[in-house]
Amino acid sequence: MTRRTKIVCTLGPATATGDRVRELVESGMDVARLNFSHGEHSDHEDNYRRVREASDATGRAVGILADLQGPKIRLGRFVEGKTYWETGEQVRITVEDCDGTHDRVSTTYKQLAQDAKAGDRLLVDDGKVGLVVVEVEGNDVVCRVTEGGPVSNNKGVSLPGMNVSVPAMSEKDIEDLEFALRLGVDFIALSFVRSPADVELVHAVMDRVGRRVPVIAKLEKPEAIENLEAIVLAFDAVMVARGDLGVELPLEQVPLVQKRAIQIARENAKPVIVATQMLESMIENSRPTRAEASDVANAVLDGADAVMLSGETSVGKYVMETVQTMARIVQAVETDPARVPPLTHVPRTKRGVISYGARDIGERLDAKALVAFTQSGDTVRRLARLHTPLPLLAFTPLPEVRSQLALSWGTETFLVDPVATTDQMFFQVDHALLSLGRYNKGDLVVIVAGSPPGTVGSTNLIHVHRIGEEDH
């Protein structure tokens, strides 16, 4: 059985050779994530090249995702590099530049003294250390430590419930975005999305560079959950980034947000990734915990297009074992025919109705596959959200679309020459499927396409076709 749910792997020091990246692809990586929170541009350029070379060598479509750091709020530096804040003591966070001491340290967020008020919470290092604001004195925010622990240079700070006035992208993000676009990545992930309007800032940079690619909204902030439907509509895909989300929201709400985000994304034919701590223990151990295996399984059961590995593959000790373990868990869950909640959404668009119709025809006629010709990937994504048991085969003349469809559930993509007629389409299907060795002459497939071919948004055709027969 072919795995349908895709796997996203973060590249890093543990995968910093061409052989390691090729092993990742062979183990099951569908999309490579370049994390711009770490590494230099030269590191990302090297990884980009390795992924493209591995994709060409293996014949597998592999997408490349550039994940922007976002305007992360951090502490400054301590004179001694670190300290330990005890529960109950008072510390000061200042917007002034200073050499950090045990009692007073700076922050990169220069509006903190303006935005903070008594009772606000600050969480340091993904919530490991908790503070509550006592008062604001000039440029200093006086806090009481509610949960003590070690703190060190440049640790991240979350401000749950505080209406922070930071832009959607920092200067670093803009530079990284321009670099990633010129490099040729297939997706951009925007961190700390709060509003559907955030995508417009990304598009403005893309238009300046002269290249648009799909933008993924990372759901990490309470404001994103409040604006969830509008954000799903505005962006091209979403990522349920459970690390920061679990700091900003009560932990018990995160599983419900995950399920809701997946459902809304499926209704709108937008790919959805579930990320963070999926097999975290495998950074150090060769086997995951039972809870982690269940977590991966539940993301599949919820209907996610993809599951993501972060530190497990970027710095972990058991990189290939982790990817192979995730692939095995996914495949085991996918053998359950009732694994995904059905979509109650009723399509109202032409392509939506055609995709539902093609799925129904294919399943009722016991077709061997659904085949979609696409210029943009949209029709394929509309088919992918239905999670049909039939193989979903996409044909496109565009290399970037082939790579982008590596993120979509259950999709196997073929790069083909442009065609001028539907007869040429059917010939391409016959040639490609017979060459695979998995299909035979006379097998029934259902083809979705646009006539005339080659025009974005022209999908208007469902054709029931027998491979190798002159029904065209």
Predicted stretch roles:
Residues 1-472:
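Non-catalytic helical/linker scaffolds that mediate oligomerization, partner binding
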